[in-house]
Amino acid sequence: MNELKHMACVPCAEAGSPLAADEIDRLRQELPDWEVVTEEGMVRLRRTFTFPDFGQALAFTNRVGELAEAEGHHPRLVTEWGRVTVEWWTHSAGGLHRNDFIMAARTGGLHEG
C-alpha cells in the first residue's frame, strides 16, 4: 500500500534542498505510473491521466486544483480533450522534494476514486 498519500507536506519555505538521486529512485518505486523528467533544468514528476471526454478531464483538473490549494503546493496542469498531464516539483527546493511525491500519490488517488 502506498503510504505517501497519508504523509503530511511541509511548508515550501521549509523545503530546503532537492532530494538526492538515490532518494528520488527509492520514492519513485512507490509511484510506478509516474515518470521522472527534467524540463527547463528542473527535475519533475510527470503523469498523464486519460478520460473518456473533456468534461471528466476538466473535473479531474478541478479536483487536483482543490487539493493543491488545500496544501499550498501547486502543480503544472495541462488539460486537453480526454487527458490531463500533471507535473509536480518544488520551485524553492530547485527540483524534487518529498512533498512532490506525497502530492503525486494523492493525485493518483483522486484518479483511482
Curated annotation (Swiss-Prot):
InterPro entries: PCD_sf, Pterin-4-alpha-carb_dehyd, Pterin_deHydtase
Enzyme class, broadest EC rank: lyase
EC numbers, comma separated: 4.2.1.96
GO biological process: tetrahydrobiopterin biosynthetic process
Catalytic activity reported: (4aS,6R)-4a-hydroxy-L-erythro-5,6,7,8-tetrahydrobiopterin = (6R)-L-erythro-6,7-dihydrobiopterin + H2O
Source species, domain of life: Bacteria
Keywords: Lyase
UniProt keyword annotation of Repeat present: no
GO MF annotation terms: 4-alpha-hydroxytetrahydrobiopterin dehydratase activity
Family of this protein: Belongs to the pterin-4-alpha-carbinolamine dehydratase family.
The protein's name in its UniProt record: Putative pterin-4-alpha-carbinolamine dehydratase
